[in-house]
Design a protein with these regions (language model features):
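Active-site neighborhood of divalent metal-dependent phosphoester bond hydrolases
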Residues: 1-80
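Alpha-helix-centered segments that form part of catalytic cores
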Residues: 15-33, 82-112
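Generic detector of intrinsically disordered, low-complexity, polar/charged segments
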Residues: 45, 69-70, 83-84, 89, ...
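Polar low-complexity intrinsically disordered regions enriched in Ser/Thr and small residues
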Residues: 51, 75-76, 89-90, 95, ...
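Residue-level detector of solvent-exposed, low-hydrophobicity positions
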Residues: 56, 74-77, 82, 95, ...
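Low-complexity, flexible helical/coil segments
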Residues: 76-86, 148-153
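Conserved beta-sheet core of the metallophosphoesterase superfamily
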Residues: 95-152
Length: 153
């Protein structure tokens, strides 16, 4: 986010020397990016969408699906970082949430499951009936008919 909106908080992995160059690249290709994506009632996002965060700012899922429009006026809501990650919020935004937040916070019920990353797991993905964190440096395939997630070897 700090490359798309230069006002966004500076965070780890920010390359200040190349910020302007990468920012221009993102802006020229902004139509190719999405905050969330849905396939067959599965919701994909970087870190997860929690009802606590959407209710706090009265954000609708429709708004999140329109990334360019969302950036036009609500981008600062993406800066919410939870206590779990050293921030000041109960739950993080869809770019900052931590999978551990899924234990105590509600997920939108209109989806079969959320597929997320952002929280590096040791060796195995974290998969429940409602959310799957697949950030283990491996590739997976989701069968939307059987709800099975399998590692691709």
């Amino acid at each position: 986010m700090h490359y798309i909106k230069t006002e966004f908080m500076d965070c780890s992995r920010l390359n200040v020397q190349r910020r302007a160059e990468v920012h221009d690249l993102f802006i020229k290709n902004i139509d190719k990016f999405q905050l969330i994506y849905e396939v067959d009632k599965y919701l994909f996002s970087h870190a997860g969408v929690y009802l606590e965060w959407t209710k706090k700012y009265e954000i609708t899922l429709e708004e999140l699906f329109d990334f360019k429009k969302f950036l036009g006026g609500r981008w600062n809501t993406l800066e919410d970082v939870s206590y779990t990650r050293g921030g000041w919020c109960k739950v993080g935004s869809c770019v900052w949430a931590d999978i551990r937040e899924s234990v105590q916070n509600e997920l939108p019920v209109m989806f079969k499951k959320q597929i997320v990353g952002h929280t590096q797991m040791e060796s195995k993905p974290y998969i429940t009936s409602r959310i799957a964190c697949l950030d283990v440096r491996k590739c997976f395939i989701l069968d939307t008919e059987t709800d099975e997630i399998n590692e691709i070897s």
